[in-house]
């Protein structure tokens, strides 16, 4: 074998010339203690608050406490592979999640990782989960309605785009159902929907995803799930992750709706973390900044000014009460932050009034500004009529002989209560709502038996769709009732009653 010395020397010279010394430095620390999803780390001197640290086994942790000689880190996953003395690396990244159209139709965890088995997420952009809410100058007053498809809400506690409307009530009163209905009602509206499940059973989240898929709503919806089996830090961060994904549309001049189900469980997860981080407890053992926990989240829902594109983010936070106690710490906090609340009552739910909305305690602080003129015209007296009905119904229990006027109010009130009942997952379009409200408030339903009210409202809509679809079109385009429309509706309802009443007398 012949060795060419000149060739070897040329190769060696080339390698010497091309040699570049690369020094990589990473700041590392050591785990002092770990347990219950919280680690104490020593040695990461220049770490930032909310920075991600890398633990053994590619486990990420989020820095929450910056102390004199160590940092408190919330672990975003299973901590069984972490032990005392483990090495921790700084990543230099603040907790961020993927945003954009790639997340639509997916079920993700709060880190933005897919849970639905539909392959990897092809998102090109990431945004930090903790951002500042829009300032006063950046906002515009709310004026566009966000139709939920639920008659009782759209008529009496209307929600506008950019509003925060709290859904509050005991367990098993239909809080999630109202929010799912609101998502289903956005099918034609171009609103991007986000459902954040916090501390829910995995089976419940699967059921919600299945319901949305069946109704074709997953095409414009994203689910962010931190289930009951996930560590507390993931449950704590999930609303912020969902909010960041939804803000992408708000900041691009589009409209988004986000449901937080529910913030009571997020507060419990935050309390658990805070106590493990040895932060001083306050009322009900919650830390002192639990109000700020929810206010900084809900303030990010806004209607932006025209200069910033006029986009909006509407929030429907859910709070679960214990035995109807709305004066507990978390419920009062969230009530004071939001622009109104829909209060659900177990007594109404058990009596078959579903959705079980207590109209007297429910309120929208945006009110008529978020309602179309047509809806205002037909539902203006409704809240008062129902309030009077309740008062008279309570009084009528003690009195047998009632005058004609009282009797009429009681009869109409009972029909209104019946009319506002609605089956699950069947949101109504706004023009259809206007028609049935018109029939009820103008007294056209007074002679229809109470147990036929639902049937009549269905028949009436079908009749108008078949015989005079122009009415629905006009309500939709004009968004107000004029004399001509009034007359057309009156004629249509009268004609429909002529065919409906004989059928039900047989």
From Swiss-Prot:
Membrane topology: Peripheral membrane protein
Catalytic activity: ATP + H2O + 4 H(+)(in) = ADP + phosphate + 5 H(+)(out)
Top-rank EC class of the record's enzyme: translocase
Lineage top rank: taxon: Bacteria
Annotated Pfam families: ATP-synt_ab (PF00006), ATP-synt_ab_C (PF00306), ATP-synt_ab_N (PF02874)
GO cellular component terms listed in the entry, alphabetical order: plasma membrane; proton-transporting ATP synthase complex
Site-annotated residues for Required for activity: 362
Positions with a binding annotation for ATP: 169-176
EC number: 7.1.2.2
UniProt xrefs under PROSITE patterns: ATPASE_ALPHA_BETA (PS00152)
Gene Ontology terms, MF aspect: ADP binding; ATP binding; proton-transporting ATP synthase activity, rotational mechanism
Entries under CDD domains matching the protein: ATP-synt_F1_alpha_C, ATP-synt_F1_alpha_N, F1-ATPase_alpha_CD
Keywords per UniProt: ATP synthesis, ATP-binding, Cell membrane, CF(1), Hydrogen ion transport, Ion transport, Membrane, Nucleotide-binding, Translocase, Transport
Cell location: Cell membrane
Family: Belongs to the ATPase alpha/beta chains family.
NCBIfam families, per the entry: atpA, PRK13343.1
Subunit text: F-type ATPases have 2 components, CF(1) - the catalytic core - and CF(0) - the membrane proton channel. CF(1) has five subunits: alpha(3), beta(3), gamma(1), delta(1), epsilon(1). CF(0) has three main subunits: a(1), b(2) and c(9-12). The alpha and beta chains form an alternating ring which encloses part of the gamma chain. CF(1) is attached to CF(0) by a central stalk formed by the gamma and epsilon chains, while a peripheral stalk is formed by the delta and b chains.
Cited function: Produces ATP from ADP in the presence of a proton gradient across the membrane. The alpha chain is a regulatory subunit.
The protein, known as: ATP synthase subunit alpha
Gene label: atpA
